[in-house]
Amino acid sequence: MDRKLIARKIAEESIVLLKNDSHLLPFSEGKMVAFFGRTQIGTLYSGNGSGGANVVGCGTILEECEKRGLMAEPLLKGFYQYKAETEPVTEQDEFDWTKVSEMVNSGIMYEIFGKYRPPLEEYEVLDTLIYQAAEKTDTAVLVIGRNSGGEECDRHLTEDYYLTETEEKLVKEVCTHFANVAVVLNVNGLIDLSWIGKYPGIKGLIFLGIPGEEGAAALAEILTGQVSPSGKMAVTVAEHYEDYPSAKYFSWDKE
């Protein structure tokens, strides 16, 4: 069997549908959707460190959804494409020198020769773009991305496990102006999900994780009903971080 078909099959059977109120999903062919979140176009396919992979040529979430008949709201699509082209991810973006002491304290050679990977900063979307998109459709897909988590020194509570201020603002704006919102978690590890229940407009929730080279294609097939999601979570998602038994003891700092 072709390796891409194998990769897609694995991804299709791994993606988890956590919420689908009012039968929001699947979307019908030709439906216009407002796509939000930088990882819709800067999709995360693999982890980092020993879990890293060459992902050149892999389709993005936006590209694969369009291939399967969804219409991306054009103004938002243009905005995210422009930001990706003019603000590409650099080595500097993936290294935070303020965390060097944490890397040393973590005591692993990977952190010395590797790098701390903070979550990439979410793009701030102009209010006018959101308003104009909401006039064309009542449906939005919001992709939350986390590239951190390759090593324990990567994970932090503030602006990592919890949403960043920019993400919180984006979630609020999207849920204010769109009646039907599906959130996709393109994350290399769990994040706080307590905010999901605060917004009635969030009717769909999908755990994509880090799905491999064909993950975006698999997600698109699930969003459009070509594949029925069958994945199950391998971990328990606590309502509050403090509910995890290891919360008091887990840290990047081994000292």
Where are these regions (language model features)?
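Secreted, periplasmic, or luminal enzymes acting at the cell surface/secretory milieu
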Residues: 1-49, 54-71, 76-116, 186-255
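Short, flexible loop segments at the rims of nucleotide/cofactor-binding pockets, characterized by
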Residues: 115-122, 158-161
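Alpha-helical scaffolding within the catalytic cores
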Residues: 125-128, 168, 186-193
